[in-house]
Amino acid sequence: MRSQAKTETVSSKSSRNTHVIFRFADWIDIVLMVLGSVGAIGDGMSTNVSLVFVSRIMNTLGYSQHNPSSTNFKEEIQKCSLYFVYLGLAILGVAFMEGYCWSKTSERQVMKIRRTYLEAVLRQEVSFFDSDISTSEIIHTISTDTSLIQQLLSEKVPIFLMHISVFITGLVFSAYFSWRLTVVAIPTLVLLLIPGLIYGKYLVHLSKKSFKEYTKANSIVEQALSSIKTILSFTAETQIIKKYSEVLERHKKLGLKQGLAKGLAVGSSGISFTIWAFLAWYGSRLVMHKQETGGRIYAAGISFVLGGISLGTALTEIRYFSEASVAAARICSRIDRISEIDGEDTKKGFIPGEKMKGRVEFERVTLVYLSRPETIILKDFTLTVDVGQSVALMGASGSGKSTVIALLQRFYDPCEGFVRIDGFDIKTLQLKWMRQHIGVVSQDHALFGTSIMENLMFGKNKASMDEVISAAKAANAHGFITQLPNGYDTHIGNRGALLSGGQKQRIAIARAIIRNPVILLLDEATSALDGESETLIQNALDQVAAGRTTLVVAHKLSTVRGANIIAMLENGSVRELGSHEDLMTKNNHYAKLVKLQRQFGHEHQQDLQDRVNSPEIQQRWSTMNSVIRLSNRSSPDLIVSPITLESNHTTKINENIPSTSFTRLLPFVSPEWKSSLVGCISATTFGAIQPVYALSIGGMISAFFAKSSQEMQDKIHIYSLIFISLTFLSITLNLLQHYSFAKMGERLMQRLRLKMLEKIFTFEPAWFDVEENFTSEICSRLNNEVSIVKSLVADRISLLVQTISGVTIAMIIGLLISWKLALVMIAVQPLSILCFYTKKVLLSKISNNYAYAQNRSSQIASEAIYNHKIVTSLGSTKKIIEIFDNAQYEAKRKGRKAAWLAGFGMGSAQCLTFLTWALDFWYGGVLVQKGEISAGDVFKTFFVLVSTGKVIAEAGSMTSDLAKGTAAISSVFNILDRPSSHENTNHGEKMGTIQGRIELKNIDFSYPNRPSILVLRDFSLDIKPGTSIGLVGTSGCGKSTVIALIQRFYDVEIGCVKIDSENLRDINIKWYRKHTALVSQEPVVYSGSIQDNIILGRPEATEDEVVEAAKAANAHDFISAMEKGYKTECGERGVQLSGGQKQRIAIARAFLRSPIILLLDEVTSSLDSNSEQEVQDALARIMASRNMTTVVVAHRLNTLKNLDCIALIVDGTVIETGSYDHLKNIGGQFSRLAHAHDLKS
């Protein structure tokens, strides 16, 4: 609420303070803006100045048509034509100034804004990110808000100034040509302004609602595709498609309203025709009774009408000023905010004379987070850590362990009490100096999307290569780094995505080591790793911690038992304090926690430590081969590091996308053939309005030069009626045109999206493993590419039909009136077309390239904000800004090119317009002088053809849209035409009943996108119906792959998977999956209610069945305790629920299906002890209640003790099978593994 109130305040202030947009302009920018404004004003004036010469030519032609051979006639025509040449050259300069100066200053100012904003935000205290702002808001500001400002400065400001110039000079010149006409016409301005403003505002309102509605649809798809295996496993495809279809239906209705609004908005511009009817009538009166000239009446009228239209356009641009003002005010409010704890401020605090020793004291500390003032995090917390001593912090979630780590880094200041280092209150120390002596390794590795070298140098900015290598060796990282393609210069992807978890953690450790810290802070540094990888990493940490003051936060006993002191925290206070042996002797809270953890196999015994320290393992450290295999095989999707794969030249799936004909869309469009026909007829007819209007203008002007007043009146009456008719036709035809094409386009878009999603759900999961088929890419295709297809079929075809009609009719009329003049005008139009095309298309292309170049710097900013705690801890703000500046260099280079092209494009387009006018009028005068045509013919031909060049250029600029549309159609049909091994989900045998026997016979398997890496080798396993089996082995041995094959997420080519002796490939896949259920390590919970999540895949379930499933999953009690019970919203991806709650909901979902085959994949690996026990109890209850075949994957062996059978897998092969007791007693590999995991009752 507070943040919202601030935003509203900022918005209200910004509406009154537009100058805030220009706050970062220096003197160079001011000069550029002044010159750009002069250019824009000059550009706007040029049209009205040209009318001075147009009126003179018209009067010369009109009044001299009975004596065209006079010398004065020829001289006047030549003189006015020459004036047009001069005006064209002048406008070349001012338009270039307009385009170049505003483009250049926008690029300069926005780059300064982005840099200053990012630096200011990174200097804020951590609590600022907790309560005042979200990460997404900052990223939105850096990308979207700054883009709004850039768009305003580069496009909207010059356009606004130009249109205001046209309006003001239009009124001035209109009064100059005929003040009487101007005074009478002023009230009609209202007719030009109000309709467009009202409909335009309503159109914007509908656009926002439409965007919001599709965001909901996109969220449904994004959540479903990001957990595609869960959707397929629970056969929930139909449910997702139904929800998606309902939202798309609402989106379609809004699209139809947009079509109507657009028709009204465009059609209302036809009101200008009615104004011309009035001006023609009143102007004829002035010619007859006030001795006004026809040329000046036309010039006065066109100046007034153009001025009114320009004012309406300028007023619509004001909303961009408002939006940019709000964005700029929002940015400046963050820049101006003074950080309460600024780690970059070297003026505050002092640096002690002696080197830091590392004694840490917490004295009666009380802390409350500003974001949760009602909750006390630490209360009367007291703890002392002597120099070189290691202290472990243990306790339940929320007890304050990580808060202690945060306080020592001075992320927060305590409400009461003191935090001291070497006896000094840390509030009095220079913060940058203090943090330089602290090293941090957390569970979240917090790496950046740059090279390994730069990531390590975040720890010490000026570190030498020797220091970097030394730190990497100390962290056991040097071996795998040197095996990467580019060694230390290897780029590791967004947030280190191209490295495994173990590799990332070791780089984070090296980054801490390179600082040579006096105090080392380890916050859950190994919690997300498997057993053996954890021990190897822990070994590196133990070596690093030696001789340093160390604080360790962990919930695993194996991590903390070697600490000098263990502090047991509860409710923000130290409940117990002492060594491991002392606390075990007391037999209190710590001892109970140890016993609970031993029950679930968290503690590693000393023999495992000995094994890690053995020569064999140390040799593995040096070569890193086995470590890479272990750390990278933590899931089926990461068998080896993608970087390693790249160096091995592994073939990547690449589907060539052939060009697709537009005719492929006909079946999707054909249901709306009536709407298409009405739209095309309306567009064709409306296209004819422009040349008819131009012809009428030419006729009106010639009528002003009629021989008699009666003849003038008769002709003006006819043209006035034509103008009025054109107004009603314009509104009617635009309504029909835009609504019909909107109806066709919206329904086409709805059909394509539904068909694509239905098709995507038939694809095998291997398809989703390829980078170009990641969730974000698929969502982009459904959103952007289908929208492009819709725009192509509806908007672009509508405009194309309208343009072809208008240009064709204009050329025919021109040729019929004066074929010689028409041919000359048509002949020079390619130049005009080329300039307008260059201006529109090239600028658009450069703008897109510039935006693309900005994306790199935005990505750096995004990572910095996402990892703001580690940036703060490392004091790396300047390093981030340095990388950010380097990333902006490419954008700066492209921006410079865009500025020159903007200036050249605008200048040449405007210049050639006036040069062609000069030629047209000169040649028209020549023809009139020769007596081949009349003055009226010149007027009519000129006005009919003068605008066709611009119209053709506008249509020609669609070539890029057509190319995009063709590519989009190809992309869409690439999905729709793609064959899938699972496409016909109703194909295959539906067995009468399923017993649950599973046979995997002689299987050799590799993932489709990694064909050279064998995951399973001659793998065989026979699982009897109704039995339970556990799959055991190190990370990457193939356990989860077996689960995937049983679900038929992948097909095997060598060997086979059988269910009840039937080949799984011959069984109806949808029917089969309805008899299975999967619960994985990461519980998938979707936005929606708890009940919606439980009934996923079985929507027909009754409320009693849902409650029964929840009770069986040990979830009913916590659900009932919530205010809305089963109707409680889970939030996106279940953010409102804890890990244990989400896991129990996932179990309830599985139980509701009454599965014959239950698959459990690392269900409890990421849970704390209490949550693990609750989930284990639920699983035990379910497995005991029904006769089902259960396959369990786990690395905590104690969870498998009660299973019927255990299979030990090594390198993709089953090497031992049997019961737990049998395998433990035979003295094989399982026995050694069991002892290593301390499996004692």
Curated annotation (Swiss-Prot):
GO terms for biological process: transmembrane transport. GO terms for molecular function: ABC-type transporter activity; ATP binding; ATP hydrolysis activity; ATPase-coupled transmembrane transporter activity. Glycans are attached at residues 48, 571, 632, 648, 773, 855, 1187. Residues 33-323, 676-964 form the ABC transmembrane type-1 domain. GO terms for cellular component: membrane. ATP 1 binds at residues 395-402. This is Putative ABC transporter B family member 8. It comes from Arabidopsis thaliana.
